[in-house]
């Protein structure tokens, strides 16, 4: 039995819609339908927040901002319920180009936590944990014009996005350099971090990346438990599939 057969429940953990992220091309409904057609069990909608490339007016009052910013998730969620795709709430936070994926929080929590808007990286970690979520460092070694420097915060993250399909998928036309993933995996190895895989997808032209499990997730908490507990799971960029345990032992080419 191959890895894909062992871990048949695939989740896109890094996805943007044009309703929350300025750089995305498609709505939540369109993304949900495309992911369902591609065989995903579920998706996390992880829009760029106010510190990143959001398309929502940052001057809006907090509750109104969160409501507008969550439209892509709402659209995907409504569609997912109709077509049989699990849709979970997430976020990609930005700090001068350094970005983090947040899992396990809800829109209601965000509305009730306005101090999150001005949180530092350290404060973000504390607040997210208080809200029952986790912080994953997104593509920590990506080099791009909007990232002035690579900054690592091992004490303020729960894990690392080790496989970002944008870096390694043959279908990707941006940020395409597998060395960024290799360095992220090496970083995870050195700190014994859990890893996630996602496509960082911005349109319905999917890469097929994601994190896969041997069971259907019951929700974001199950996702968190499944990657934090030491249980086996799989990571893919849509082309290659890896066992987490094997990836943690594989020496990486770093330059």
Positions of PLM-derived features:
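Charged catalytic cores and adjacent phosphate/nucleic-acid-binding surfaces used
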Residues: 1-13, 17-21, 27-33, 96-111, ...
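Short beta->alpha connector loops
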Residues: 93-94, 116-120, 140-144
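Conserved beta-strand positions in the central sheet of alpha/beta enzyme cores
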Residues: 44-45, 136-137, 161
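An N-terminally biased module of ancient metal coordination in phosphate/nucleic-acid-related enzymes
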Residues: 1-95, 205
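Glycine-rich tight-turn/loop motif centered on a GG-T
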Residues: 61-63, 108-114
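S-adenosyl-L-methionine-dependent methyltransferase catalytic core, i.e., the SAM/SAH-binding region
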Residues: 123
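Short, well-ordered beta-to-alpha junction loops that form the rim of enzyme active sites
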Residues: 48, 92, 138-141, 199-201
């Amino acid at each position: 039995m191959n890895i894909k057969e062992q871990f048949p429940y695939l989740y896109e953990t890094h996805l943007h819609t044009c309703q929350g992220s300025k750089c995305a091309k498609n709505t939540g409904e369109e993304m949900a339908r495309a992911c369902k057609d591609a065989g995903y069990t579920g998706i996390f909608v992880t829009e760029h927040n106010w510190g990143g490339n959001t398309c929502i007016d940052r001057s809006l009052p907090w509750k109104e901002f969160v409501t507008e910013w969550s439209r892509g998730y709402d659209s995907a969620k409504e569609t997912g319920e109709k077509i049989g795709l699990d849709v979970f709430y997430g976020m990609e936070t930005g700090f001068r180009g350094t970005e983090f994926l947040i899992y396990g929080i809800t829109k209601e929590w965000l509305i009730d936590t306005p101090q999150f808007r001005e949180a530092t990286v350290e404060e973000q970690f504390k607040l997210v944990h208080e809200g029952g979520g986790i912080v994953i460092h997104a593509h920590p070694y990506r080099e791009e014009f909007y990232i002035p420097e690579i900054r690592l915060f091992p004490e303020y993250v729960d894990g690392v996005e080790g496989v970002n399909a944008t870096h390694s998928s043959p279908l990707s036309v941006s940020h395409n350099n597998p060395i960024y993933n290799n360095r992220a995996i090496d970083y995870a190895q050195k700190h014994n971090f859990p890893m996630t895989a996602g496509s960082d997808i911005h349109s319905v032209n999917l890469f097929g990346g994601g994190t896969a499990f041997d069971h259907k997730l019951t929700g974001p908490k199950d996702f968190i438990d499944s990657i934090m507990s030491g249980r086996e799971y799989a990571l893919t960029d849509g082309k290659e599939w890896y066992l987490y345990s094997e990836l943690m032992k594989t020496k990486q080419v770093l330059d």
